[in-house]
Swiss-Prot record:
Can complement the yeast pex11 null mutant. GO terms for biological process: circadian rhythm; peroxisome fission; peroxisome organization; regulation of peroxisome size. This is Peroxisomal membrane protein 11E. The lineage of its organism: Eukaryota, Viridiplantae, Streptophyta, Embryophyta, Tracheophyta. Belongs to the peroxin-11 family. Involved in peroxisomal proliferation. Promotes peroxisomal duplication, aggregation or elongation without fission.
Amino acid sequence: MTTLDLTRAELALIVLYLNKAEARDKICRAIQYGSKFLSGGQPGTAQTVDKNTSLARKVFRLFKFVNDFHGLISPVPKGTPLPLVLLGKSKNALLSTFLFLDQIVWLGRSGIYKNKERTELLGRISLFCWLGSSVCTSAVEIGELGRLSSSMKKMEKELKADDELYRAKLQKSNDRTLALIKSSMDIIVAIGLLQLAPKTISPRVTGAFGFTTSLISCYQLLPSRPKLKTP
């Protein structure tokens, strides 16, 4: 391939990536938490960017609760242990509730819904739902990693480490490990936003962890590169 062809291919991937509403949301999330880290909770330009970006992001999430509600009522893969099923459904229910309540919070903070006290209350409830969903996600990923590890050990004993199925399981294990790291860090972000441990998890710590998980989310949404044809 020529340099021009490679450039076109790279630009096509960028366009594909930026066409995803979820990707744009996560880029804005990185800006939001990066600003929170810079402001350290103190008034100024960085804090203004943090608050404005947070409000703008809520528009990306309008009706997004339908996705997790669909996951809640969808059947699970056969052979999934009951504890993992319950944790997965709990995650879907909590995340769907968070996203639904977040719409009301957006209405309140944009001035459409006038009850400020109820808006703040629903905002805290929604964050607790997100905290709970992050805990459930971490537990699910730990359980699934255990299942993958057991399956891979059996394959290693059968001397099939070079098998395509083994490599696919290894990639899946890596993906779940990254998801576990992200969800564990999101727990800290949620605790910081709720100010449950203000002495330990300051706005700057919350911003640092939020910025990191945003970058992880951006990475997870990257489109796979097409295989290049060799001459």
